[in-house]
Amino acid sequence: DYLHKMNPRSRVYGFIGGTSGLFEGSCIEIQEETLKLYRNTGGYDLLGRSADKISEEDYEKVIASCTKYDLDGLVLIGGAYTATDATLLTEFLLNSGIKTRIVVVPCDYSRDLKNNFVETTVGFDTYCRTVSSLIGNICTDSRSAAKYYHFIRLLGRSPSHVVLEAALQSHPNYAIISEEVAAKRMTLLQV
């Protein structure tokens, strides 16, 4: 919306499959009609995503896509690896004389990018809210089956932030922080 307000002739492309689409030059033009269906819902199902790290061999493919679509800017959405890739790719594009500028939108549920410049990342609050809701549902169901124990494991490189946030919202009987257990070398009986 903002881009078209500033310049109605602007075009926005989305690369299908994330960086793999960028490498292959496979994209669609994002138009108002298409975007209406996905507004405020995320959008992974619109374009898909990939977890590819950009290698030096891929740089030339990125240049080909940037040139083919005459891109003034390239927005990468992701976590720490994406930010690192964007930094290296930016240097390469600058040294190659390509006009495309790169912007990174931090999106990472594990808060790996939180620092003095990034207060929070897109995805963390949504992830915590969703996890808390699911844990709350399980807590409600478990009241009717008191003879069973329910264990919920949250995944990630360092899920402690999510565990603590979800525990504050859903009030489970126990919340075990795996980093603390590992640091103290606790056994199952000690936990």
Q: Which residues are covered by each model-predicted region?
A:
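Conserved beta-strand scaffold positions in the cores of enzyme catalytic domains, especially
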Residues: V12-G14, Y44-L47, I102-V104, F151, ...
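N-terminal phosphate-binding or glycine-rich loops at protein starts, especially the Walker A/P-loop
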Residues: D1-F23
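Accessory alpha-helical/coil subdomains and C-terminal extensions
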Residues: L76-G78, T84-L88, F92-R101, N116, ...
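Glycine-rich oxoanion-binding loops at beta->alpha junctions
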Residues: G21-D72, Y81-T82, Y109, T120-D125, ...
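Cofactor-binding loop segments of dinucleotide-utilizing enzymes, especially the Rossmann-like FAD-
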Residues: G17, G79, V105-C107
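Short acidic/polar active-site loop segments enriched in Thr and Asp
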Residues: S10, D72, N173
